[in-house]
Amino acid sequence: MASTVEGGDTALLPEFPRGPLDAYRARASFSWKELALFTEGEGMLRFKKTIFSALENDPLFARSPGADLSLEKYRELNFLRCKRIFEYDFLSVEDMFKSPLKVPALIQCLGMYDSSLAAKYLLHSLVFGSAVYSSGSERHLTYIQKIFRMEIFGCFALTELSHGSNTKAIRTTAHYDPATEEFIIHSPDFEAAKFWVGNMGKTATHAVVFAKLCVPGDQCHGLHPFIVQIRDPKTLLPMPGVMVGDIGKKLGQNGLDNGFAMFHKVRVPRQSLLNRMGDVTPEGTYVSPFKDVRQRFGASLGSLSSGRVSIVSLAILNLKLAVAIALRFSATRRQFGPTEEEEIPVLEYPMQQWRLLPYLAAVYALDHFSKSLFLDLVELQRGLASGDRSARQAELGREIHALASASKPLASWTTQQGIQECREACGGHGYLAMNRLGVLRDDNDPNCTYEGDNNILLQQTSNYLLGLLAHQVHDGACFRSPLKSVDFLDAYPGILDQKFEVSSVADCLDSAVALAAYKWLVCYLLRETYQKLNQEKRSGSSDFEARNKCQVSHGRPLALAFVELTVVQRFHEHVHQPSVPPSLRAVLGRLSALYALWSLSRHAALLYRGGYFSGEQAGEVLESAVLALCSQLKDDAVALVDVIAPPDFVLDSPIGRADGELYKNLWGAVLQESKVLERASWWPEFSVNKPVIGSLKSKL
């Protein structure tokens, strides 16, 4: 496959324009085309190229430099573009099942063009669509057809004005009326209004509404999803009893219409209940295929993880763009040098390498992890769709919930910090809006809070781990999970006896070193958190109080260390598999080691506190290894960016273009701005209407 491309298949992977980046491209230790083929595969590369080419050649997607669209116009344009994506039909339902990784690939392509477009398409097709598919049954298949024909437009309505992360406190109700075989969807007051719901503001015709299901006799069975029509598809006017509107302008992603809805005794057919987890008979009896409440809860958790798993991919695409812009800039921006006559690229400075290259490694590690986690989610959803009610299926749901709940914070925070570092690493030019880093920062920011506040989600993961340890302590159970993310904990007493014994930088340049340290760290934090929790309870704290007292210094770092270990483990295994071409092993090994050691270095205090590290040498070796790996990857940085960067039209950043003509591109873009050379329309305010100094000063 690689030889075909190297032999001249420039249609798939065309050569880059000659220019200032040539020197770095020539120094790369590997072929960027070979790495692209290994990472993506030829079929996926062709799929992405089809999408990018369609967008670039379609006038509807034309870039408008300097255009300041009104909120209304941006929303309209984003909807028209979303509709056009359906007209292109890049990914059929059949293709989704055949090649599931094309789903996040499509979302990444759209998100690289505009996060608002990706969010709008994702919320309708995948979040709304997968909720109906995985939580519904055969009676809901007609909705699936309408979703992908865009005959209806959907949204996912869980959050309320006064409650988001605390889903148990959601107050929307669904009372069943056996006389009419209908559910009555009701918002008791404005605080129970569904709020922040993407697509609900102006366009959604249907919503998956989460409400407390109650049957006659005041028996309530917790939150269940219902498909509820909120607007007439023919007029987009609200349905009777539904008050629906837009919440207004946001900090970013303003092409997406986030909205609210209140329901005043809205009657929907009994069949509106998405009944995979539980159903109500015509007479009003609640039934569930899950006899064990814990199994039902585990399965439902997994079905709700699709949004969080998608956000991991959305966050990473923003980091890909930011890193591509900053590293191409750094390779062409020359400042200072060993002599006054010779300036060198800022990428040659160890400080710039240390600031940016760990985020490049993070892109590769987290991107691989997000794909693998998506495939895990696909396995779960296929089990749900086939009616698998096994204990393994429920446990898979709980494990994916734990991984998604921690990987969303990790990915969104890493991207948040990475974009800011990229912005600053580009100096003043990074602050110029046309170079896109500010837009990326604002568009990524909601990833930190929607689908669950990051810090709250981390508690979900730490609770999962604490529950496993409690089960082991009280029942002698082994640590086992379907995806094997916790299996290493079975050996935790022996792991805790280990120490960091690497004494040289050379011996530290392997992700296996960080893997061993991470396993110790997770075992240590799990033990310490468990002991702290029990100590707080013995001191009189309730379970609620005890968990909150443990979270800051114990539970939070436990959850982050666990998910970082999982990311490092999966990427380490990926880059060390036998199928890796020999010519790529060195660069992939360095990326894996850099991400692992850089991530681990942020836990140095805990490693010392627990006794895994001792003396100055351990910390110095770790720090020196990170710097050494940055230096080793410096000459490969531009080629590594070439693998992940979209075409210039999509990247849309003058300082990040593939030709490396930094100043030519930036100067040209500045001169193309609207009215850039015209005097201000309010020029008479200076030239004619002079101020009368002191005329407004108080006479008292």
UniProtKB/Swiss-Prot annotation:
Transmembrane segments: none annotated. GO terms for biological process: fatty acid beta-oxidation using acyl-CoA oxidase. Gene3D superfamilies: Butyryl-CoA Dehydrogenase, subunit A, domain 2, Butyryl-CoA Dehydrogenase, subunit A, domain 3. It is found in: Peroxisome. GO terms for molecular function: FAD binding; fatty acid binding; flavin adenine dinucleotide binding; pristanoyl-CoA oxidase activity. A motif (Microbody targeting signal) lies at residues 698-700. It holds the Pfam family ACOX_C_alpha1. GO terms for cellular component: cytosol; membrane; peroxisomal matrix; peroxisome. Pathway: Lipid metabolism; peroxisomal fatty acid beta-oxidation. The modification N-acetylalanine is found at residue 2. Its cofactor is FAD. The modification Phosphothreonine is found at residue 281. Keywords: Acetylation, FAD, Fatty acid metabolism, Flavoprotein, Lipid metabolism, Oxidoreductase, Peroxisome, Phosphoprotein. Its EC number is 1.3.3.6. It catalyses: a 2,3-saturated acyl-CoA + O2 = a (2E)-enoyl-CoA + H2O2; (2S)-pristanoyl-CoA + O2 = (2E)-pristenoyl-CoA + H2O2; tetracosanoyl-CoA + O2 = (2E)-tetracosenoyl-CoA + H2O2; hexadecanoyl-CoA + O2 = (2E)-hexadecenoyl-CoA + H2O2. Its main location: other. Oxidizes the CoA-esters of 2-methyl-branched fatty acids. Belongs to the acyl-CoA oxidase family. This is Peroxisomal acyl-coenzyme A oxidase 3. The lineage of its organism: Eukaryota, Metazoa, Chordata, Craniata, Vertebrata. The gene is ACOX3.
